[in-house]
Amino acid sequence: LDKSAFDFDFIDIASIEVLKGPQGTLYGRNTMAGLVNIKTLSPLEKQGSKIKLSFGNYNLWGVAATTSQKLTDDFAFSINARYRQDDGYFKNEYTRQNSGSTRSGGGRVQLDWRVNRHWKLSFSGDYEGSDQQGYPYAGYDKTLKKTGSISYNDEASYRRDIFTSGLSAQYLHDRFIFTSTTGYQFLDDDMHLDQDFTPRAIFTLQQKQKMHAVSQEFAVKSHKGKRWEWVGGLFGFYQQTHTDGPVDFRQDGIDLLITKQTNDQLAALKQNPALAGMPDITIDIDNRNLYIDGIYKTPAYGAAAFGQATLNRIFIDGLSATIGLRIDYEHTRIYHHTHATEDLTGHANVTINMGNRPPMSIQQPFILPLGIDGKESMNTIELSPKFEVKYAIGNKSFVYALATRGYRSGGYNFQMFSNLIQSQIRSSMMSELMKNMGGGGNGGRPAPSRSAVGMPAFENTTDVNQAISYKPEHSWNYEIGGRSQLIDHRLFADLSLFYIDCHDQQIAAVSGYGRVTKNSGRTASYGLEASLRATPTNRLLLSATYGYTHATFQEYNDGKNDYKNNFVPFAPAHTLALSGAYTLPLDKETDLTFDLQYLGRGKIYWTEANDAAQNFYGLVNASIILSGKYADLKLWGKNLLNQHYQAFYFETMNAENLSMPNSFVQCGRPITFGADITIKF
């Protein structure tokens, strides 16, 4: 349920199914871009044991062991354990230590029980712990298009423990199939960031969270091959997340982000002709650091009902129509407590022009307690319909047209609370200064009123819920396409054309002290996907896949810039995958396979302004596999031409020049190579 839990290792994969486009009708929330359905091998279907050893450059090594055994004809289990590490591919020039090294390990158990000819039960539990030393973000000059070095001084790391379990029950009736799926997930992670990614001591961020999530689905579906095929069910979930997200402003951060920024704003105010009588004011801060602690509890729960029906053989054989609908209700709440562990203290240096009299100089101390407490909530009801018409031409080809609606849940940006504290500092400081100036503290002389010295009033009227929240994203997807077997069992072709109309698309953006998710108005995307798979001989497999996407903003103005007709960030215009595999039998039990792959993608724009981008690039991968009855040997290499490219780009606040954000990139992995040895018994 949580995106921090998406990245983990699998062993004993039986199949991987990629479902494109919104899958919300059957699968619900956050599947508007598609779904990857991964199935693992059942110990009832395959038994045996194996040990896999892996070695590679950059000190890569790993070990994995698995065993699947039957205790009876109807009850079986599988157990596996794994460990993997590498030293990362880059170096932090400031610390002279590797950046991006990873250590991960875990285990999985699966129990499958065929109770009788009707009932089947399956339980799985998976644990994984990982420790990463990050992050390999290097400075980047957008003007010169030049990548600098990785150089920052504070800790950057990510540690995660995750446990996922599931219990499924299936009842096979003569007329229908009933399934019950129960899931539980526990996540405990801890992220540290040098948020400025520079050698200066500006500010750091920690985000530590614990999450418990449970889900339940009941579904009933018909058997395949009937004229009416249908599925319906109920779904519910509950998720409780506790997040600690402190931000620590170091000495440079206080000097640049509080003292200098406040003094610059005061100087700018004085230049306003309407405030010609405003006194000269500067401030000094006593704190050596300012620790802003943030504690956030975010419970969420939801329920859904869904159904889908397909009518086959409409008027003629091969013609079918599908209609589906899902209704989701979701409630999300946040209890937030953000506060400075110590008051912000300092003094203001005020010089008031008294006309014909000597200027009045005041050194006014201030003590500012900082904190924001409260609770916010959002409720959403979503409808996800699906309409599809399909025509099958025999058993070899079909064409289709469909329209589906998808959505992605809204949420809250924890990092926005640091921005709100900054606003509170400005408003509280000015209010405190004006209160004290109006009440004494000036050597016994009567203090002039605020209006007499031309001071403006400062009030903090920020709507917290509006500042920290982002809305759900919605889209309508339209697609036409087809699949054909052009030559019997030798050549397969797929082609699809799509158009996506998206509203309130969620994008990552720079906002004050970090990156946040925000809504971007309306976007439109259109394109195509085409693939060919050929087996000219039983030993040779060739495949080619190409995708084109044209995704642009139709309506998006962030209050400063209008991005209409700009390309949507992080959406590659072209994707290309070419692969070939040739298998040479050496004897009855031994094969030698040569595999070659080319993967290309780009152009990718990184920002809404389209002022930073990665051009099209391609990676060459290859492997040689010697496979036998008792052992396998695989020699592999990735990015064999050592292509240099940007895997990720982002911008963050430049503390030294607030008008010009800092840019950073994560470079792609260089050439890597290694060997896997698998022993089977």
Residue locations for each model-derived region?
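Membrane-embedded beta-barrel scaffold of Gram-negative outer-membrane proteins
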Residues: 168-193, 400, 426-519, 524-526, ...
